UniProtKB/Swiss-Prot annotation:
Role: Pyrophosphatase that hydrolyzes non-canonical purine nucleotides such as inosine triphosphate (ITP), deoxyinosine triphosphate (dITP) or xanthosine 5'-triphosphate (XTP) to their respective monophosphate derivatives. The enzyme does not distinguish between the deoxy- and ribose forms. Probably excludes non-canonical purines from RNA and DNA precursor pools, thus preventing their incorporation into RNA and DNA and avoiding chromosomal lesions.
Catalytic activity: ITP + H2O = IMP + diphosphate + H(+); dITP + H2O = dIMP + diphosphate + H(+); XTP + H2O = XMP + diphosphate + H(+)
Organism for this UniProt entry: Plasmodium falciparum (isolate 3D7)
Annotated positions binding ITP: 7-12, 48, 73-74, 90, 147-150, 170, 175-176
Subcellular location: Cytoplasm
Name of the protein: Inosine triphosphate pyrophosphatase
Keywords carried by this UniProt record: Cytoplasm, Hydrolase, Magnesium, Manganese, Metal-binding, Nucleotide metabolism, Nucleotide-binding
Quaternary structure, from the entry: Homodimer.
Cofactor remark: Binds 1 divalent metal cation per subunit; can use either Mg(2+) or Mn(2+).
Amino acid sequence: MEIYLVTGNMNKKEEFLKMMDEELNVEFVNINLEEIQAQDIVEINEHKVKTAYNILKKQDNNKNKKRYVITDDTGLFISKLNNFPGPYIKWMQKALGSKGIADVVSRLDDNTCHAICTYSVYDGKDVHSFKGITNGKIVEPRGNNKFGWDNIFQPESLSKTFGEMTFDEKQNLSPRFKAFVQLKEFLMNEHKKYNNEF
């Protein structure tokens, strides 16, 4: 059983390794994937994981081996902007930066939002998707910006942005971690089933 996480983002790779059980061996592959244009973050990610799986399968001589390919996607959904930018946050971030996004939201009478992260895993037959959601608000930039908009996202009922938190503080709150817990449970169960077959 081989597990591949498709990412070229070193921060995501580092975070994934901190969360993953050592019992599961994960290979990281960097594949440039086209994303479909859609509002549904799960739909986008499921398309992405199938594309990645097919690319990896074509590159491998052993077409019959059991492989699980994982992709992730994240969105920031600003309430007063009808949940825009959602899955288009990376483009908005690229165009405006964190400060620009915070400036836009500061002109609204409501700065609430929610962040969603999805992991999708595909084994060539079935796609399984896992979603984590964290409610919060957009604030002026504070802290580091290791992950895109961390320095402007302040989780509900807290006074720190993700950018001001340590890894451990952020871990239990982040939508990525919430989705990851579900993904890890799924992979551990698949790993047990796979080992019982041999």
